[in-house]
């Protein structure tokens, strides 16, 4: 809860415009849009982002090009950089991103590149670190790096397989 805010911000994960409407109608302040929830979440299409943006609830869009780990090669980072630009251009208010090195540390260069793509597309875009933090070698140390990178939000399950288990 921010200063002057009377209640916490409610963000609900959705996979469709219909889900975004339900979230809006039940008091969501914003939605996080992705596809492939059973795979840990994947980047939705530009058309899906547009349809969710049309609902009117601010959307944060997950940018993740494949299931599995969060260690991405140069080709995948280039793809996700293009996806960041695409989802912002399609109406996303922000992106949910992340990348780790093979050693389990935050891939600062990749995260900075994705952040830069978002802010070039929209200087007001919010950039959130996703659940890569939950499998990082040092989650607390990883979180400490985020302010210097300009990331102000973290999507986490508290290090557990599901958020309810990590509370």
Q: Where would I find each of the regions flagged by the language model?
A:
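Conserved, mostly hydrophobic/aromatic
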Residues: 23, 87, 114, 130, ...
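A short acidic, helix-capping loop that chelates divalent metal ions and anchors anionic groups
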Residues: 66-72
């Amino acid at each position: 809860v921010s200063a002057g805010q009377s209640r916490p911000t409610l963000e609900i994960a959705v996979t469709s415009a219909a889900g975004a409407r339900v979230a809006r109608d039940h008091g969501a302040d914003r939605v996080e849009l992705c596809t492939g929830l059973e795979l840990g979440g994947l980047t939705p299409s530009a058309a899906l982002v547009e349809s969710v943006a049309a609902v009117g609830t601010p959307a944060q869009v997950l940018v993740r090009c494949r299931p599995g780990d969060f260690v991405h090669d140069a080709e995948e980072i280039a793809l996700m950089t293009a996806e960041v630009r695409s989802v912002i251009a399609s109406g996303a208010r922000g992106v949910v991103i992340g990348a780790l090195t093979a050693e389990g540390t935050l891939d600062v260069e990749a995260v900075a590149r994705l952040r830069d793509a978002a802010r070039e597309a929209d200087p007001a875009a919010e950039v959130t670190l996703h659940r890569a933090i939950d499998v990082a070698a040092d989650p607390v140390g990883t979180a400490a790096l985020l302010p210097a990178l300009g990331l102000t939000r973290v999507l986490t399950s508290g290090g557990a397989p599901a958020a309810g288990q990590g509370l």
